[in-house]
């Protein structure tokens, strides 16, 4: 069974690649050096520095493998070149009004989501509800606390 593709914006892909490069070129060799230094201090059975470095190494190697798997599955989301940016899709920045409050969100893939920075997942209740709609439409958003009605003010 083929694994599901993961939508990602150009900025998100670049950030993922930069993190991968940093971990492989800087953190991995740094941790290897720390482990070697800790080994040189004698008995590793009760060496806190060695234990901490091995823990860090496991975390870093796990993250490297995770990023490698993500990079195999990502699908770069490009903005349409035909000029039709009026439909909400992954990569769109959308301004909505809910109960008189105006919010602006960028719809991104789940791996890029950071709600505190206004980047919401296309899989979140708000993101999922907005996809495929246009400015001027009123869209129901199903949340754990009930249904909210959002008016789409602008799509960029």
From Swiss-Prot:
One of its GO terms (biological process) is DNA-templated transcription elongation. GO terms for molecular function: DNA binding; RNA polymerase binding. The keyword Transcription regulation applies. It comes from the Bacteria. Keywords: DNA-binding, Transcription, Transcription regulation. InterPro entries: GreA/GreB_C_sf, TF_GreA/GreB_CS, Tscrpt_elong_fac_GreA, Tscrpt_elong_fac_GreA/B, Tscrpt_elong_fac_GreA/B_C, Tscrpt_elong_fac_GreA/B_fam, Tscrpt_elong_fac_GreA/B_N, Tscrpt_elong_fac_GreA/B_N_sf. Necessary for efficient RNA polymerase transcription elongation past template-encoded arresting sites. The arresting sites in DNA have the property of trapping a certain fraction of elongating RNA polymerases that pass through, resulting in locked ternary complexes. Cleavage of the nascent transcript by cleavage factors such as GreA or GreB allows the resumption of elongation from the new 3'terminus. GreA releases sequences of 2 to 3 nucleotides. NCBIfam families: greA, PRK00226.1-4. Belongs to the GreA/GreB family. This is Transcription elongation factor GreA. The gene is greA.
């Amino acid at each position: 069974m083929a694994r599901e593709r993961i939508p990602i914006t150009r900025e998100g892909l670049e950030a993922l690649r930069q993190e991968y490069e940093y971990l492989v070129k800087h953190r991995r060799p740094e941790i290897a050096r720390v482990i070697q230094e800790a080994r040189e201090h004698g008995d590793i059975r009760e060496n806190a520095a060695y234990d901490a470095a091995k823990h860090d190494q496991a975390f870093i190697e796990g993250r490297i493998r995770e990023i490698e798997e993500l990079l195999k599955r990502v699908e770069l989301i490009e903005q349409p070149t035909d000029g039709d940016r009026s439909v909400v899709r992954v990569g769109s920045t959308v301004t909505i009004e809910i109960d008189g409050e105006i919010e602006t969100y960028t719809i991104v893939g789940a791996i890029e989501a950071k709600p505190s920075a206004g980047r919401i997942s296309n899989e979140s209740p708000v993101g999922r509800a907005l996809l495929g709609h246009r400015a001027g439409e009123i869209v129901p958003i199903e949340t754990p606390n009930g249904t909210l009605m959002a008016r789409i003010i602008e799509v960029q």
